[in-house]
Amino acid sequence: MFGFQRIGDQIWAAADQRPRGFLPGATSGRTTLGGEGLQHQDGSSHLHAATIPNCMAYDPAFAGEMAVIVDRGIRDMMIEQKDVFYYVTLMNENYAQPTLPEGVDEDIIRGCYLYKQFTVQQPRACVTLLGSGAILTEVIQAAERLAAQQIEVTVYSVTSWSEIARDGRACEEALLNEAPEPGIPFIYQQLGKSKGPIIAATDYVRALPESVRAYLPADRRYMTLGTDGFGRSDTRAALRAFFGVNAETIVKAALLALK
């Protein structure tokens, strides 16, 4: 239940033996299990998971995303007979589970899909918000507040930072090897549907969203928010305010990036 930060070496040893299966991370993020303090709150597991080549790591925010990921995992491991295993972080927070947009299943597996566009009449600016797992609800609240200020917002749910980064690296390697069709990073393509500076917020250390910086459009400012440091014992709201990953801080970051 304490994530890769406690048992990472055992998972690495297992990876060498080509395991298959689902490994649920039952304390997703550093602010989700509010009273456990610095010992048990997990802010780095997805960084550890990204270092293991046959580990598919996901941080879903909604039950619909989870269903898509589990379905693909079963197909990969049982039908396609791939020697991979899935690390999926879970939450224990109660909030509404929306219906997923049509046609996003493959985007969920690849790591990022367009969740919603908050359009306004005669917007005075545009901004893009990326959120994952426990913090996506804070991102959505921030988008609503920004839209109330006549700022148009595009929200993406990032289901896997590590899969996005791996895709970007594969495109870079193809370029280095002079492949005839090296491809365009998936996250670069996805963000083509949005405008303005990009703000990313997660319940993990900032190094996680920073891992995709190289594959974003170079002409757009990118700011990351995360939970660097030790965990603390407090309520979810207080923890998210302390680490600066709550809706209020996301709004402030977006307004700062627009200056």
Describe every region a protein language model picked out.
Residues 11-13, 46, 74-78:
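A generic local secondary-structure boundary/capping motif
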Residues 40-47:
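Short, glycine/polar-rich helix-capping loops at beta-to-alpha or helix-loop-helix junctions
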Residues 14-29:
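A glycine-rich helix N-cap at a beta->alpha junction
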Residues 13-18, 50-52, 147, 212-215:
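Alpha-helix C-terminal capping segments
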Residues 18-21, 54-55, 196:
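Short glycine-/polar-rich loops that comprise or flank the Walker A/P-loop
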Residues 32-40, 57, 65-69, 74-259:
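Thiamine diphosphate
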Residues 1-3, 26-28, 38-39, 58-63:
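Active-site nucleophile and cofactor-binding loops and adjacent substrate-binding regions
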